[in-house]
Amino acid sequence: MTDRTAEQLAQDFTAMGHSVALITDVIAGNAMADEDAAERQGCVDRNTQHLELMVAKDDWGSESMTATNAAISAGNGYTAS
């Protein structure tokens, strides 16, 4: 795997932040409230999987993964109802 450029790292980290926000908002009921449970679950599952793949990359620098890891834990524990 080729290391990502600083610009790519920044873009990926920003995208991860969007996934963190979406997972958090769906779980809190602030996003996708009008969607059915399967749609909400699918959204959380996809974004959680994305974060798991991204956090596993080995070319991160000093970026904090605290919020990302919290969102992964929350997403993995989420069951839409």
What is the predicted role of each segment?
Residues 1-81:
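Beta-rich interaction/scaffold domains
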